[in-house]
Swiss-Prot record:
UniProt GO cellular component terms: endoplasmic reticulum; extracellular region; Golgi apparatus; photoreceptor outer segment membrane
Self-association and partners: Interacts with RHO/rhodopsin; the interaction promotes PRCD stability.
Predominant subcellular localization, coarse grouping: other
Protein name, per record: Photoreceptor disk component PRCD
Keyword hit for Transcription: no
InterPro entries, sorted: PRCD (IPR027937)
Residue ranges, annotated region (Disordered): 24-54
Function: Involved in vision.
Positions where lipid (S-palmitoyl cysteine) attaches: 2
Organism: Bos taurus (Bovine)
UniProt record similarity statement: Belongs to the PRCD family.
Length: 54
């Protein structure tokens, strides 16, 4: 009984990891596209600002 439960829980965890790595499509709304692009710009600009400080 315990072995079966352990096996099923392990398989469930592995399947979750496998399917959770799929890329989710961005929302079709304009707000989603704008917020996504601004987030990428913020991350890139913060990375560029840190490089000269070193």
């Amino acid at each position: 009984m315990c072995t079966t439960l352990f096996l099923l829980s392990t398989l469930a965890m592995l399947w979750r990891r496998r399917f959770a790595n799929r890329v989710q499509p961005e929302p079709n709304g304009v707000d989603g596209a704008v917020s996504g692009s601004s987030l990428e710009t913020d991350l890139q600009s913060s990375g560029r600002e840190k490089e000269p400080l070193k």
